[in-house]
Amino acid sequence: MDGDIRKNSYDDGSMDALTGEQSIRNFNINFGPQHPAAHGVLRMVLELDGEIVERADPHIGLLHRGTEKLMESRTYLQNLPYLDRLDYVAPMNQEHAWCLAIERLTGTVIPRRASLIRVLYSEIGRILNHLMGVTTGAMDVGALTPPLWGFEAREELMIFYERACGARLHAAYFRPGGVHQDLPPDLLDDIEEWCERFPKLVDDLDTLLTENRIFKQRLVDIGIVTEADALDWGYTGVMVRGSGLAWDLRRSQPYECYDEFDFQIPVGRNGDCYDRYLCRMAEMRESCKIMQQAVQKLRAEPAGDVLARGKLTPPRRAEMKRDMESLIHHFKLYTEGFKVPAGEVYAAVEAPKGEFGVYLVADGTNKPWRAKLRAPGFAHLQSIDWMSRGHMLADVPAIIATLDIVFGEVDR
């Protein structure tokens, strides 16, 4: 059955059906929650035009445990372990904010030795976090070696956690009034020796990634955040420093004894994924310097108490064996807990991911009336839509990696 292709007709007079204008719609896909690059239980509905992201809709709540509500029915000390389970990559930094809030409301002054130990372990937490963030972020864009190197150093830091408090991850080591117990005598030597070796590892990661052509193609000019964007979205931490704003609570609103330490605040210039990566690399070097200074200050500090003895903290064991009042205080402290005077306070620390804050409302009882947790990752994740819009699908994992998101704190 021959015909005339130009007239769209056949010899028998029949015509071809003309295809009407087809409506082309965008392609929707689910990114996660089982995706390895989602950094937890992130589910994102991505609307794609070809391979260009038109819309990214994050669905959170898959790890929601109702932490803030649970905290209202527990004593202040019982609430401490909940803080470990928020950003579980660097647990002690969250405990720090909780302890600071209670200490400000009760007017507790902690011993200097405890303050130095807190600074030391907060910086260990920062390195733990950045090693995880940088190396797994590199793996998301195709570099498989960095995690193998980074996790070796993380393992050594976890052992320092374990030697201080017995737990590798959920430490509950910072306590209202100080820290749970003093450090073993040889631990400071081992931490100092580790600090001497660590810059070599950062140099190796630097050599592997920083000037790597493929790595730069995947990160440069991806997920750009301007200074105005950072302020509008409530960014903190590396997200705001990568855009050129030198905002770090350790310097701008010093807590503990950070004002005694000498360290630099790395600041980016372009606000893209690459600058945020460079900031994290530089922060690891600075944290290492702070750790070395803390070790030297702890050596110079005479051995003394690491808890402010009073109503917030348990008595010494020797006192309990000698004194009935101390035994009663110990029993009451761990059954009823201590009472915090009525009032409200906001305490924030420069956690590795940004400003982690606790807004605590106390009503004079042994339990908090309300505790609001300000997680930095929550503010960062809510802007994933405009950050990834117009980028390729393959750029989304790179953006998520440099946002540095952990779902324990996002979902709470």
From Swiss-Prot:
Keywords, alphabetical: Cell inner membrane, Cell membrane, Membrane, NAD, Quinone, Translocase, Transport, Ubiquinone
Name of the protein in its database record: NADH-quinone oxidoreductase subunit D
Species the sequence originates in: Paracoccus denitrificans (strain Pd 1222)
Membrane disposition: Peripheral membrane protein
Stated family: Belongs to the complex I 49 kDa subunit family.
Compartmental location: Cell inner membrane
Complex and partners: NDH-1 is composed of at least 14 different subunits, Nqo1 to Nqo14. The complex has a L-shaped structure, with the hydrophobic arm (subunits Nqo7, Nqo8, Nqo10 to Nqo14) embedded in the inner membrane and the hydrophilic peripheral arm (subunits Nqo1 to Nqo6, Nqo9) protruding into the bacterial cytoplasm. The hydrophilic domain contains all the redox centers. NADH-quinone oxidoreductase forms a supercomplex with ubiquinol-cytochrome c reductase complex (complex III or cytochrome b-c1 complex) and cytochrome c oxidase (complex IV), which stabilizes the NADH-quinone oxidoreductase complex.
Alphabetized NCBIfam families for the sequence: NuoD, PRK06075.1
Record Pfam families: Complex1_49kDa
Stored HAMAP family: NDH1_NuoD
Reaction equations catalysed: a quinone + NADH + 5 H(+)(in) = a quinol + NAD(+) + 4 H(+)(out)
Function description: NDH-1 shuttles electrons from NADH, via FMN and iron-sulfur (Fe-S) centers, to quinones in the respiratory chain. The immediate electron acceptor for the enzyme in this species is believed to be ubiquinone. Couples the redox reaction to proton translocation (for every two electrons transferred, four hydrogen ions are translocated across the cytoplasmic membrane), and thus conserves the redox energy in a proton gradient.
Residues passing through the membrane, by range: none
GO molecular function: NAD binding; NADH:ubiquinone reductase (non-electrogenic) activity; quinone binding
GO CC terms, sorted: plasma membrane
Keyword Translocase included in the entry's annotation: yes
Enzyme nomenclature, EC number: 7.1.1.-
